[in-house]
Every structure is written in C-alpha cells, then in structure tokens.
Amino acid sequence: MTEVLFKYHGNLTGRAHFPTLATEADTTSDKYSNLYMYVGLFLSLLAILLILLFTMLLRLKHVISPITESTESVPQFTDVEMQSRIPTP
C-alpha cells in the first residue's frame, strides 16, 4: 500500500517541471540585485562598527585625560597639593 503511494504521489522526479517566464528572464538588475544587497549590508555594518569604535575611543580619551575648562588664571592643583595648603588651626 505504501509503495503504491510513494510510486504515484510521493515521488515527483517523473514529472517534468518547465521553467516559468520569471526564471528565464534574467536582466542585468536581477543579476546584481543580490550583490547590491550584500554590498549595502556590508557598508551599513561597517559604518555602525566605525561609529562604535570612534565613540569608544572618545570615551577612553575622556577617561585618560578628562575635559577641564581651560582657564589659565585659575591654577590647577592635585589632591595632595590641596591638602598641604589647607591651613590647620
């Protein structure tokens, strides 16, 4: 019984499948549509990675040398220098 089902219903190798007009018509835009998609995907991922890299580098730069307001009239002191200048009663 199952052999009869496979012979007539399950096996599609005996049937001829002719290509439709959509698969036969191969224009230039169809040839390169996948290429354009992959190039666009690659460029967008590259742009995202570059943006992340630059933001991480800027954060690291601010951690290493924090931004201070550049006022030349006000001297900058470290904590050790400030503790030695505090008057003691």
Swiss-Prot record:
<feature type="transmembrane region" description="Helical">
    <location>
        <begin position="38"/>
        <end position="58"/>
    </location>
</feature>
<dbReference type="InterPro" id="IPR031741">
    <property type="entry name" value="SERTM"/>
</dbReference>
<keyword id="KW-0472">Membrane</keyword>
<dbReference type="GO" id="GO:0016020">
    <property type="term" value="C:membrane"/>
</dbReference>
<keyword id="KW-0812">Transmembrane</keyword>
<dbReference type="Pfam" id="PF15872">
    <property type="entry name" value="SRTM1"/>
</dbReference>
<keyword id="KW-1133">Transmembrane helix</keyword>
<protein>
    <recommendedName>
        <fullName>Serine-rich and transmembrane domain-containing 2</fullName>
    </recommendedName>
</protein>
<feature type="glycosylation site" description="N-linked (GlcNAc...) asparagine">
    <location>
        <position position="11"/>
    </location>
</feature>
<keyword id="KW-0325">Glycoprotein</keyword>
